Amino acid sequence: MIVRIGIMALRLCVLLALIFGILLWVNAIPDWGVMAHMTLGLLAVISLWLLAFGIATAPKGRNWGLAIGAFVLGLLLPIVGLGQLSWLSLGNAHIVVQIIHLLLGLGAIGIGEMIAARYKRQNKLA
């Protein structure tokens, strides 16, 4: 049950954070969008860690590699995201940081889906 809830929350939070992030990138929403994006990102990281906990403590098919990978990715995502605020002085190189943050976010949904699929396969959830 923890994996089902975790993957649904992760999907929703990453999708909404991605939408807010793109709108922020093109300056289409006001400054409150930053806080909404950060809140959704935090919820996505918590969901990812919930999935990591689920696969690490699964009765069958434990996978420590996926769990550790999800935990590390969950740490990197806000570090790079919050780091953007202080790295704005990089000028044109700032776009590289934005792209890295975007790729980490997409990686979060990817590893979350991998965890959910592995858990379902190993534990025969419908």
Say what each PLM segment does.
Residues 1-126:
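Polytopic transmembrane helical bundles with strong interfacial aromatic enrichment
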